[in-house]
Amino acid sequence: MIEQLRKERVRQTRGSQRKLYWKVPGSVWGMDICEIRMVNLPGKQFILCVADLASGYKFAPMVTTTEPCGPQVSAHLEKLFEQFGRPLFLKRDNGGNLNHGAIADLLSHNHILPLNSPCYYAPYNGAIERGQGEIKWKLRREYGDVRTFGEFARSTGLVVHDLNHHPRRKLDGSTSCIRFFNGPRVNYSKRKRKEVMLWISDQAFDIVEKASGDMKPDAAYRIACQIWLVKNDHLSVSKLGEVLPHLSGKTAHN
């Protein structure tokens, strides 16, 4: 038991020292669901946030009074794919509604690779969670007096629009909207997507074999995805300000 706790702490420490920098708009999206209580509204309100990680561009959110179920999330994603194109990867947490069979079918049909957070390190999806924090803070600050769900839904849309047009230091003073729509975006064909999937699958298998039983398949898959992203210049990983070279299967655990 003590050894398990020690390994858990080491994993968390390694993750907290790493910073991921997403380079290519359109290649990796993230999604998560957050909840918020408003003073004049009963119960909780739920917001499904989906964003492009490289640009920070937040797509139109789905707002509900109950936590969205898998088919609802899938339907919302499908609309976004039709409107904005398909990412190559979709980052998400491990909640059942974000890992529902309907979503798995949608991703498979569109040849999109799921990329789940490690169970031991929730901040792996930190970019999308920071975006949620911005939305909630701005909602409470500027629209805290809304009295109907309709007003809340409209206010959430306005907040997302404002954030997409806010200059960002990490974008060199540009906005998420400009970076997503005006910059080069990934647009992989079905054939290329299949090639990427096969490469990652083979790499993950090799990682498991080399680990001699000390590596779970989902961790190996996550490592293989990260290796591909770094090698193809979609992602850079820094550790305490130092940019790391291409990751090997034995060092990239997040």
Spans of features found by a protein language model:
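Mobile-element integrase/transposase regions
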Residues: I2-C49, Y57, C69-H76, Q83, ...
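Short, conserved catalytic/metal-binding motifs centered on acidic residues
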Residues: D32, G56, L90-D93, N125, ...
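A short acidic/small-residue loop/turn micro-motif
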Residues: L53, T64-P68
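Distinct, well-ordered alpha-helical segments
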Residues: L77-E78, I103-A104
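Acidic/histidine-rich, metal-coordinating catalytic segments
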Residues: E82-H100, P118-Y120
